[in-house]
Amino acid sequence: MIDTTVRPQTRRGGATAAAALFGVSGLLFLLYPAVRPYSDYLNETTLDGARAYASGGWVAAHVFGMLGFVLLGLAMQALRDVLRGTPADRIGIAATVVTWVGVGLTLPYYGAEDFALHSVAIRALGDGSPDLLDLVVQVRGGGTQMTMFASGLVLVAAGAVTAAVAIWRSGVLARWSGIPLAVGFALFVPQFFGPPWVRVAHGVVLAAGALWLAAELLRPRRDAADAR
């Protein structure tokens, strides 16, 4: 007969890893909009836009975003260890799988926007001509890449919502502790249509949600009754 019980030290180790990964991921999602230059807003095919794309801040900000997504996927895997053997076991697996698929679909767009636009902008500034910046629209707005990007972000949001449901049903974490992070990722697509301050505020929401969940994961494990 297979032993399906989960050793306390295994759950504690998973909780510590998940807390660290969620915490760092949340901070990276805050740095992403905070460091990003915004001179390209309403000026994406002008030299003002090129100055944003060519800056070190542009590259760093998008790298922060990409690392945030990777760490989010790893955090979901570690959270699954915490939920193993609870009523939310299968839901935790679903959250991990959906999140990773979403991350996989999202990252190619971030890579293109980061490195391709950076290279195009450096060349445009060197030539003193904005003509090359017509490529910005092609890099950003093609049907295939936009579909992958939007689908990826929707799946990441679905993964975060599924994780919140798993946490609610698990009995080992405070029921509400996954909801703020789920709300943050549900707002990931809409925040792109807001002004810079909205994007920075969204980063604050994501960081707060991730740190809240991290703090809950570091609390001593409780039984189902106490976790409510």
Residue ranges and their predicted role:
Residues 2-228:
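Hydrophobic, aromatic-enriched alpha-helical segments typical of multi-pass transmembrane helices
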